[in-house]
From Swiss-Prot:
InterPro entries: Adenylosuccin_syn_GTP-bd, Adenylosuccin_syn_Lys_AS, Adenylosuccinate_synth_dom1, Adenylosuccinate_synth_dom2, Adenylosuccinate_synth_dom3, Adenylosuccinate_synthetase, P-loop_NTPase
Task of the protein: Plays an important role in the de novo pathway and in the salvage pathway of purine nucleotide biosynthesis. Catalyzes the first committed step in the biosynthesis of AMP from IMP.
Keyword Nucleotide-binding set for record: yes
CDD domains: AdSS
Residues that, per the record, bind GTP: 37-43, 65-67, 328, 354-356, 437-439
Subunit field text: Homodimer.
Binding site residues for IMP: 38-41, 63-66, 155, 169, 247, 262, 326
Required co-factors: Mg(2+)
Organism in which the protein naturally occurs: Drosophila willistoni
Catalytic activity: IMP + L-aspartate + GTP = N(6)-(1,2-dicarboxyethyl)-AMP + GDP + phosphate + 2 H(+)
EC number: 6.3.4.4
Protein name per Swiss-Prot or TrEMBL: Adenylosuccinate synthetase
Keyword Magnesium annotated: yes
Source domain of life: Eukaryota
Length: 449
């Protein structure tokens, strides 16, 4: 090859390469739970949604529960992205979400009764999202009951069985419901037969279900689009996009405390696969960290406090699951856990929520290390629940501030010890804290920088 030909080929490569790297005029910012869920992601998304064009859900189903307080009204969302409270924002339910249509329409009706309007013009559902059927929920409950004393603490919303159907390639997607209904009927009968064979005690009235889903098809049709094309077009046109992760990093099926996890990837990888986005579209990755730690259901919890401290956190923090209504288990903030989820997710900044719940404490403990029973320090987060359940926790003791922070709106006006608590977390994680929450509403989020 001549020198001139090589130069032409080199320039051609550079032009194409630059075109690929600069094809998107905007980025996708992501909000992820950094612990076991219930960190306050919905409130953070609600705050940021006022400045973006599109808010997306990428995984999970109505096993998630997000509470948003807007204009004095409290909204509970399970399938809908929290951004729906912003009337200027388009909300997207991506291909990675599994959708129980009866629950979706119940949620739409309940929130419309609270004042949400014109959702048909600003909610888009992926045609590739899989459906959760009632028999999935029945199977979920049966599988949990079979485990007896070793139950996983599932929400029994059918999420795991629906993802199982997806993985075994006999699941049904939203787009198939809207296509030839005879083909949908055949697939539905087939998936029911499979589940009845595996679980003989479940009873499905196939004709009644098909009649119901024929009605749902027309109800959901106006909302359904190819969300992959929609999002890529939006990015090329410079539209700003925010992704609301459901559940949290420690519930991720790969990186969480398996098997006490959910059935989807609720870390950064699930954002890409659940929306059809390439890695170069990702901008800020915001980790939402509760100022202490909670989890719902079973599974190891190194910093859990089964004492008056745990009771105080549970009571002051109103720690009851939005979806399950179960009391949340409570404990101290866990730095090794947060370092691990930061490693997996690559947080570019952090939002600390519910700092005000610690207002009454004279002393606050923070987990700073794990060690084995023989005294050996761990330099990694345990990969098995057996190991995690047997470790000993090393704590740092920080002084409390014992004064209310609830009405403070400027970081420098927080008590010095409260500021020190935030800076301690920032220093330990080497990730900047951008916001601190001291109350329920979006107005209670303090911009640190």
């Amino acid at each position: 090859m001549s020198t001139s030909s090589a130069a032409v080929n080199g320039n051609h490569y550079e032009q194409l390469h630059q075109g690929r790297t600069k094809m998107y005029k905007s980025k996708v910012d992501v909000v992820l739970g950094a612990q076991w869920g219930d960190e306050g992601k919905g409130k953070v998304v609600d705050m940021l949604a006022s400045e973006v064009d599109i808010v997306c859900r990428c995984q999970g189903g109505n096993n998630a529960g997000h509470t948003v307080v807007a204009n004095g009204t409290e909204f509970d969302f399970h399938l809908l992205p929290s951004g729906v409270v912003n009337e200027k924002c388009i909300s997207v339910i991506g291909n990675g979400v599994v959708i129980h249509l009866p629950s979706l329409f119940d949620e739409l009706l309940k929130n419309q009764a609270k004042g949400l309007s014109h959702l048909e013009n600003r909610l888009i559902i992926s045609d590739r999202a899989h459906l959760v059927f009632d028999f999935h929920q029945h199977v979920d409950g049966m599988q949990e009951a079979e485990k007896g004393g070793k139950s996983l603490g599932t929400t029994k919303k059918g999420i795991g069985p629906a993802y199982s159907s997806k993985a075994t390639r006999n699941g049904i997607r939203v787009g198939e419901l809207l296509g030839d209904f005879n083909l949908f009927s055949d697939k539905f009968k087939s998936i029911v037969a499979t589940h009845v064979r595996l679980f003989p005690s479940i009873n499905v009235d196939v004709d009644a279900e098909l009649a119901r889903y024929k009605d749902y098809a027309e109800k959901v049709r106006p909302y359904v689009k190819d969300t992959i094309c929609f999002l890529h077009t939006a990015l090329r046109n410079g539209k700003t996009i925010l992704v609301e992760g459901a559940n949290a990093a420690m519930l991720d099926i790969d990186f969480g405390t398996y098997p006490y996890v959910t059935s989807s990837n609720c870390s950064i990888g699930g954002v890409l696969t659940g929306l059809g986005l390439p890695p170069q579209t990702i901008g800020e990755v915001i980790g939402v960290v509760k100022a202490y730690t909670t989890r719902v259901g079973d599974g190891p919890f190194p910093t859990e406090q089964l004492n008056e401290v745990g009771d105080l956190l549970q009571t002051r923090g109103f720690e009851v699951g939005v979806t399950t209504k179960r009391k949340r288990r409570c404990g101290w903030l866990d730095i090794p856990l947060l370092k691990y989820t930061s490693l997996v997710n690559g947080y570019t900044c952090i939002c600390i929520t519910k700092l005000d719940i610690l207002d009454t404490m004279a002393e606050i403990k923070v987990a700073v290390g794990y060690k084995r029973s023989n005294g050996e320090k761990l330099d990694h987060f345990p990969g098995t629940i057996a190991e995690l359940g047997s470790i000993e926790v090393e704590y740092a003791n920080l002084p409390g501030w014992q004064t209310s922070t609830e009405h403070i709106r400027n970081f420098k006006e927080l008590p010095e010890n409260a500021q020190n608590y935030v800076r301690f977390l920032e220093s330990e994680l080497s990730v900047p804290v951008r916001w601190v929450g001291v109350g329920k509403g979006r107005e209670s989020i303090i911009n640190v920088h």
